Structure formats: structure tokens, C-alpha cells
């Protein structure tokens, strides 16, 4: 479980915690062997994610928007918690998430096991029913790579869930991606970014998660995050901390070098090699 800070130029994990399944959390023998602290109890991944975001707010880390992938974005309590912290979000969601149909507003809370089926729809069905003019081709970039493009639609919706119904309903963006050649839409997001945001800026925000995916890849390939073979709680977190520190150094160095850097790196003076110098291992080295 990680929390990263990201902008359009760089990103870096700032919180890292091993997820402990409920079976482990309740197994005293396993906990003792792995050295799991007594204070660590079972929590769902969305609960841990919200704790990490809350911690970042409490210590004053910068950031006005939370990006959440589809594995977490379905959790209404996580989204509400982010809003309560004064942050906006762009959250990936699953196609089956229910929203109120355009023009409909949340009404009475249905009895358990019942749904106001005529007034709600899945985001997938809503997307499939949109007219052709609702879709626009939008371009975005991922770092210094070439421009990417896909088809998107966006509209304002109210989410239909028991948690949202218990609170004051809010209208938010539903962003849908349906690439050319695909039989159906491939990605969906909910966002509390301002209603005035431009279409392209909304897409840019949703696509910024590529930096986090790159972090995972480089942490494993460049600094050995995946090399840990121990079984200890403290050992794993120590290993992860050292890997993140090393990765932070690489990120800072990368920022001084074009095209990532804002300007050309300062040229360092080339020092002359002493006449007496011989390469290590040379047959004439002294």
C-alpha cells in the first residue's frame, strides 16, 4: 500500500505499508514470527489508503487532488473521506457502479435489498447510451513521450449508493474512455474537480496516474524493491524505506537533466587528469 506525491514533472512514494489480510491479523503465531506490532490490526485497503491521505494532510504535505485507481475508487467511504479532508479526487471506478440517470435526483432511500431501478443505471449502460456527439478525441502526454489520444465523454452525475444517500448528494464528473476499435468503453472515473474544468484538463488529471505506475516499475527494476526475501514486518518496511530513499535520489538527479529538467544542467569544469594517474588494473599502475 503506497501513497505518492505527484505533479506533471515527477512523483515519489511518501508512505508505504504492507497490507495484512484478516487471516494474518487474527493469527497470533504468524504475527509473532513476522514481528507484526500489536498496534497493527486488520483494516481494508481503502481504510489504509484514507489513513495515509489523512496523515499527509496532517503533516502538511502538498497536494490538492487525490488520484485513486479502480481498485479503490468504488469505495464510497474513501471518496467521502477524501472530500471531508478538503481534497478533490479523480477516482477510477468499475463499469457496474450505479449513478442516477441524467435529470434524476436522489430520492428516498430504498428498503434493504431494493433498488430504484427505473431511476438508476450503471455507468457502462449510461456510456453505451450516449450519442455520438458526446464523444471527443482528446490528446495527452505521459512525460516526454509522444502525444497519445483516445475518445472520451464526460457528464455530471450523482452516485447512487446507500452512503451517498445518507449524505448531502453531490454532483460530480463522470469521465469515460472508449478508444476507437474497442467494442465498449474501457475506463471510467468519478471526479470532484470543479464543474468549470476544461475537458482536456480533466483527462490530463485522470491520466496522471501513469507516473505512479512508473514508480512501481522503477522501484522494482532500478532499486530492488522486489528483491526482499525476508518474512519480517520490520525488515520489509526497512527495505522499502531504503528503496524509496534511493529512488528519491534518482528522481532528484533526473530533474537536473533535460528533458525532465527545466533547463540545461550546469556544466561542471573538466578537471585535468594527473600525469601520474594510471587506471585501476593497468599493467603499469603503481
Where are the regions a protein language model picked out?
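Short, conserved catalytic/metal-binding motifs centered on acidic residues
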Residues: 3, 65-74, 89, 189, ...
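Metal-dependent nuclease catalytic cores in nucleic-acid-processing enzymes
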Residues: 1-7, 248-250
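Generic structural signal for hydrophobic core residues of well-folded globular domains
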Residues: 193, 206-209, 219, 248-253
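Basic, amphipathic alpha-helical segments enriched in Lys/Arg and hydrophobic/aromatic residues
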Residues: 223-285
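An anionic, glycine-rich sequence signature occurring as long contiguous blocks
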Residues: 6-42, 90-94, 99-211, 279-281
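Domain-level cores of phosphate- or acyl-group-handling catalytic modules
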Residues: 30-105
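Short, solvent-exposed helix-loop connector elements
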Residues: 77, 137, 191, 199-206, ...
Amino acid at each position: 500500500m503506497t501513497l505518492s506525491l505527484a505533479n506533471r514533472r515527477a512523483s515519489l512514494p511518501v508512505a508505504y505499508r504492507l497490507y495484512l489480510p484478516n487471516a494474518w491479523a487474527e493469527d497470533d503465531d504468524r504475527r509473532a514470527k513476522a514481528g507484526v506490532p500489536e498496534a497493527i490490526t486488520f483494516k481494508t485497503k481503502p481504510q489504509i489508503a484514507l489513513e495515509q491521505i489523512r496523515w499527509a494532510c496532517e503533516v502538511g504535505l502538498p497536494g490538492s487532488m487525490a488520484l485513486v485507481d479502480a481498485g479503490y475508487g468504488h469505495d464510497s467511504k474513501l471518496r467521502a473521506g477524501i472530500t471531508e479532508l478538503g481534497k478533490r479526487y479523480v477516482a477510477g471506478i468499475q463499469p457496474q457502479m450505479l449513478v442516477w440517470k441524467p435529470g434524476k435526483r436522489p430520492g428516498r432511500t430504498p428498503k434493504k435489498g431494493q433498488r430504484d431501478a427505473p431511476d438508476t443505471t450503471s455507468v457502462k449502460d449510461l456510456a453505451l447510451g450516449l450519442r455520438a456527439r458526446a464523444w471527443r478525441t482528446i490528446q495527452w502526454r505521459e512525460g516526454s513521450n509522444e502525444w497519445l489520444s483516445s475518445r472520451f465523454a464526460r457528464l455530471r452525475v450523482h452516485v447512487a449508493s446507500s452512503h451517498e444517500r445518507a449524505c448531502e448528494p453531490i454532483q460530480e464528473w463522470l469521465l469515460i474512455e472508449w478508444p476507437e476499435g474497442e467494442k465498449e468503453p474501457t475506463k471510467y472515473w468519478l471526479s470532484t474537480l470543479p464543474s468549470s474544468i476544461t475537458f482536456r484538463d480533466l483527462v490530463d488529471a485522470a491520466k496522471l496516474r501513469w507516473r505512479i505506475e512508473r514508480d512501481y516499475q522503477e522501484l522494482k527494476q532500478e532499486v530492488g524493491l522486489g528483491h526482499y526475501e525476508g518474512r519480517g514486518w520490520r525488515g520489509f518496511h526497512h527495505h522499502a524505506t531504503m528503496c524509496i530513499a534511493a529512488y528519491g535520489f534518482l528522481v532528484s538527479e533526473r530533474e537536473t537533466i533535460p528533458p525532465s529538467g527545466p533547463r540545461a544542467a550546469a556544466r561542471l569544469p573538466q578537471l585535468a587528469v594527473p600525469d601520474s594517474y594510471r587506471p585501476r588494473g593497468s599493467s603499469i599502475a603503481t
